Curated annotation (Swiss-Prot):
HAMAP family: Cytidyl_kinase_type1 (MF_00238). Its EC number is 2.7.4.25. It comes from the Bacteria. One of its GO terms (molecular function) is ATP binding. It is an enzyme of class 2 (transferase). Signal peptide: none annotated. This is Cytidylate kinase. ATP binds at residues 12-20. GO terms for cellular component: cytosol.
């Protein structure tokens, strides 16, 4: 009898704290991690490395199908490794991000990457970080969490991150951008950003990250009977 590895899906809007929560869960439980938001960016780098035409859906599909990528967490730091090389910084390049949005428009590439994401499911378990992990990618996951926070709080968090990196930022502009993205994500025709029907909805607006982690762990342990 084949035992299917459990999955904990963490969905939610940008700035809600998904990344921090997922890293903490992966380290605490010693499970695998999937950062779905990085997948398309990694594919762009792989295409550049292998001189595959970015505008060729036919050429990108086999590359997406066999994408050699893994996500490693150590002491709260996430490393994205492509073909043995740490590309954590390279995927944050603005050009890479813009190109990733372009290739995401290819239906067959999306389908290939959907299958590739599902292949991350392996023992002892998987923490899946994204926007449609519980609704589209792993609809059978036993533990689904939708992490949310007010748009004001998410804009404030983003502002602090940018300021810590030395950038001058305008809060109102950040807030406007976040609200616009929320509207797009929640009203798109394919895989809208909504909690799965059986997801635990956690509002992190007035919670510390330690409180969020504790609530998520307690929920997962109750469902999965983890020690």
């Amino acid at each position: 009898m084949t035992v299917i590895a459990p999955v904990i899906t963490i969905d939610g809007p940008s700035g809600a704290g998904k990344g921090t929560l997922c890293k903490a869960l992966a380290e605490t439980l010693q499970w695998h991690l999937l950062d779905s938001g990085a997948i398309y960016r990694v594919l762009v780098l792989a295409a550049l490395h292998h001189q595959v035409a970015i505008d060729s859906e036919e050429a990108l599909v086999p590359l997406a199908t066999h994408l050699d990528v893994r996500f490693e967490v150590e002491q709260g730091k996430l490393s994205v490794v492509l073909e043995g090389e740490d590309v954590s910084q390279a995927i944050r390049n603005e050009t890479v991000g813009n190109t990733a949005s372009q290739i995401a428009a290819f239906p067959r590439v999306r389908e290939a990457l959907l299958r590739r994401q599902r292949a991350f499911r392996a023992a002892p378990g998987l923490i899946a970080d994204g926007r449609d992990m519980g609704t589209v990618v792993f609809p059978d996951a036993p533990v689904k969490i939708f992490l949310d926070a007010s748009s004001d709080e998410r804009a404030y968090r983003r502002m602090r991150q940018l300021q810590e990196k030395g950038f001058s930022v305008n809060f109102e502009r950040l807030l406007s951008e976040i609200k616009e993205r929320d509207d797009r994500d929640r009203n798109r025709a394919v895989a809208p950003l909504v909690p799965a029907a059986d997801a635990l909805v956690l509002d992190s607006t007035r919670l510390t990250i330690d409180e969020v982690i504790a609530k998520a762990l307690a929920h997962a342990r109750q469902i999965l009977a983890l020690s």
